[in-house]
């Protein structure tokens, strides 16, 4: 089972549920702040499919953080002390626009 509660196949067994899972994640990642919405959409579009289960777990925990903290971390106004979040931030910032 996936983090969002849907049934998820392994990489060898793609299913029709993957687009639905991605849509749920896009909805969950919506913040109403254009900058954050754009960054999270880029991550889901360019990285999610090849991300490891560990990285996916970090991303889902990241979404539980307060919006103002996410914005300060991703914009570089504040350094995130959590090493796994810091690595994810570097990954998100490096994604193509």
Curated annotation (Swiss-Prot):
Keywords: Chaperone, Cytoplasm. InterPro entries: SDH (IPR005631), SDH_sf (IPR036714), SdhE_FAD_assembly_factor (IPR050531). This is FAD assembly factor SdhE. It is found in: Cytoplasm. One of its GO terms (cellular component) is cytoplasm. Belongs to the SdhE FAD assembly factor family. Its main location: cytoplasm. Pfam families: Sdh5. One of its GO terms (biological process) is succinate metabolic process. An FAD assembly protein, which accelerates covalent attachment of the cofactor into other proteins. Plays an essential role in the assembly of succinate dehydrogenase (SDH, respiratory complex II), an enzyme complex that is a component of both the tricarboxylic acid cycle and the electron transport chain, and which couples the oxidation of succinate to fumarate with the reduction of ubiquinone (coenzyme Q) to ubiquinol. Required for flavinylation (covalent attachment of FAD) of the flavoprotein subunit SdhA of SDH and other flavinylated proteins as well. It comes from the Bacteria.
């Amino acid at each position: 089972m996936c983090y969002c509660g849907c049934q998820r196949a392994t990489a060898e067994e793609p299913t029709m549920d993957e687009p639905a899972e991605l849509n749920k994640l896009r909805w969950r990642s919506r913040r109403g702040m254009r900058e954050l919405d754009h960054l999270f959409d880029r991550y889901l579009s360019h990285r999610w499919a090849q991300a490891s289960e560990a990285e996916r777990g970090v991303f889902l925990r990241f979404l539980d953080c307060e919006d103002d903290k996410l914005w300060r971390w991703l914009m570089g106004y504040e350094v995130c002390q959590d090493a796994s979040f810091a690595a994810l931030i570097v990954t998100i910032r490096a994604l193509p626009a």
